Amino acid sequence: MRETESNNKVLLGMSGGTDSSVAALLLQDAGYEVTGITFRFYEKENDTEYLEDARALCERLNIPHLTYDVRDTFRKTIIDYFINEYMAGHTPVPCTLCNNYLKWPLLKKISDEMGIYHFATGHYVRRRFINGCYHITTGVDPDKDQSFFLWGLPQEILQRMLLPMGNLTKARVREIAAERGFLKAAHKRDSLGVCFCPMDYRTFLHKELPEGSILPGKFFDEMGNFIARHKGYPFYTIGQRRGLGIDLNRAVFVKEIIPAENKVILSDLKALEKTEMRLKEWHITNPALLLNKDDIIVKIRYRKQANRCTVTLQPDNTLHVQLHEPLTAIAPGQAAAFYRDDVVLGGGIII
């Protein structure tokens, strides 16, 4: 950090969308000297409208605007990971990886270089200081809460981040944009899904992989009996029911994917239930608040399945998660995030 650092300065990640636009307004209202930065992570067909929107907003607010091209890094660390995980028969979580290992670390790095203490985004999350550590907590809008994706942030980031959107609903954010005359931002549609893969991921894999990388294979039941042909194992995920292309007059789900044999195992829903799992690449904000406790909630999908659990550290440096009730469709590669009430305690990647 340069000696010129100032606690009233903030570097704001700006996508040109509604959330980061209102975040800039709110930070200015709070007395911060804002600098906007737009990361060039991925551009579909050279679409740079988001850059122009962010630049125009900064010009209107009379704040500096920077762009930072990280497309090569994003390709190597996020997109290639996404493709490789599906080719390994896993279910990837690119937004978790991007936030914890790319976006927020980049904000810190550039802030340090510029002598700016704070950095911020338009994420719908909050922050709280508990027992000597900062923690991410859920945003007040349950439909927009993004805390699930931020379990891996270290203290050096948590202690300097600003989160102006955490106490607002999306409806109120749109109202603020309209009230302040930022009508384009107020009416922008929310981005859905993975930023670089807005279409079905299967189409994306076909586009990105060499011809012949994905070949037809076979569905089997749990007893090893052949059921039908499938289009290629990367096109299926654990727990999937729709889109299998078969009619057995009963509900069947993907239970297991065997990449080496291009096999997909199908079963009934009950067979997908598990009462334990292991995590790698984990991060815990404060081990004293998480390990060996019986009041921890684990979530394995964004805004979906949650259950009480007990978490223990294993000799091989993995986390063992004992579920108090079964969960279905626990898939390798997915993220698991730990909570107590609204506080994020950590998380990891399911093995």
From Swiss-Prot:
Binding positions (ATP): 13-20, 39, 122
Keywords for the protein's UniProt record, in alphabetical order: ATP-binding, Cytoplasm, Disulfide bond, Nucleotide-binding, RNA-binding, Transferase, tRNA processing, tRNA-binding
Keyword Iron-sulfur: no
GO terms, molecular function: ATP binding; tRNA binding; tRNA-uridine 2-sulfurtransferase activity
Family matches, as CDD domains: MnmA_TRMU-like
Subcellular location: Cytoplasm
Pfam families in the record: tRNA_Me_trans, tRNA_Me_trans_C, tRNA_Me_trans_M
Protein EC: 2.8.1.13
Residue(s) at site: Interaction with tRNA: 123, 334
Catalytic function, reaction form: S-sulfanyl-L-cysteinyl-[protein] + uridine(34) in tRNA + AH2 + ATP = 2-thiouridine(34) in tRNA + L-cysteinyl-[protein] + A + AMP + diphosphate + H(+)
GO process annotations (BP): tRNA wobble position uridine thiolation
Active-site residues from the entry: 98 (nucleophile), 195 (cysteine persulfide intermediate)
Disulphide linkage map: 98-195
GO cellular component, as recorded: cytoplasm
Region (Interaction with tRNA): 144-146, 301-302
Task of the protein: Catalyzes the 2-thiolation of uridine at the wobble position (U34) of tRNA, leading to the formation of s(2)U34.
HAMAP family cross-referenced by the UniProt entry: tRNA_thiouridyl_MnmA
Family designation: Belongs to the MnmA/TRMU family.
NCBIfam families: PRK00143.1, PRK14665.1, trmU
Protein name (Swiss-Prot/TrEMBL): tRNA-specific 2-thiouridylase MnmA 2
